[in-house]
Design a protein with these regions (language model features):
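Contiguous beta-strand segments within globular domains
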Residues: 54-100
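Short extracytoplasmic/periplasmic juxtamembrane "stem" segments immediately C-terminal to an N-terminal membrane anchor
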Residues: 37-56
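N-terminal Sec-pathway targeting helices
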Residues: 1-19
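Short, solvent-exposed, Trp/other aromatic-anchored flexible loops in extracytoplasmic proteins
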Residues: 119-162
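Extended, solvent-exposed segments with strong compositional bias
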Residues: 95-137
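Beta-strand elements of well-folded, non-transmembrane domains
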Residues: 91-95, 105-109, 156-162, 178
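Short beta-strand elements
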Residues: 162-181
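Membrane-interface motif at the C-terminal end of an N-terminal transmembrane signal
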Residues: 17-43
Length: 181
């Protein structure tokens, strides 16, 4: 085989690989949000009340959350699909264990970002007390896309240290948007 044939075969191989890479890249980008279509154009039920999370809090507002007087377990969600959501959870720590958030799309009851959400919002309760205490977590919601709002039920859960049985403590409905990958 002559040198010119070897060069031609080498250049042809590089061109074919480059074209294959471009097609693969196009396919990946086109299918990036595949599956998120079920979160587009969801009708928000009119018979339920929903809050839309405030996008952010000032440092002073965040500091003031510790002074809120609470008489029941409570969840407040702050943020958006772009930068993620902050979860402020109030709970009276009468038992050692783990406190965390679960989220469900409300009309189809689909659990959202199951592993990430429970892991990133998990707070270990080691000190017990008679007063409600503020716990904080942060996570993205991966399902959906920016500016396509859909109804979500956020639930506060507790799992005792010496048991695998989870207990749902409270829930709150919001309309949120997801994170574009």
């Amino acid at each position: 085989m002559t040198l010119s044939k070897k060069i031609f075969i080498g250049i042809s191989t590089i061109i074919i690989l480059f074209i294959g890479f471009v097609f693969w890249l196009f396919f990946e980008i086109a299918n990036e949000n595949k599956g998120d279509e079920i979160f587009y154009n969801i009708k928000i039920p009119e018979n339920l009340n929903f809050d839309k999370p405030i996008e952010s809090l000032t440092y002073q507002q965040i500091d003031s959350l510790t002074n809120i007087e609470v008489n029941d377990d409570k969840i407040v969600v702050i943020g958006d699909g772009y930068s993620g959501y902050d979860f402020y959870m109030w709970h009276k720590p009468t038992e050692k264990g783990e406190l965390y958030i679960k989220a469900f799309e409300l009309t189809q009851n689909i659990q959202l970002s199951e592993l990430e959400l429970s892991t990133r919002t998990e707070n270990e309760i080691t000190e017990l007390g008679e007063n409600y205490k503020l716990y904080i977590g942060n996570s993205l919601i991966y399902e959906g896309t920016f500016a396509n709002y859909y109804p979500v039920r956020f639930e506060l859960w507790f799992k005792p240290k010496n048991s695998e049985i989870e207990k749902k403590l409270t829930e709150k409905n919001y309309v949120i948007d997801g994170w574009d990958r």
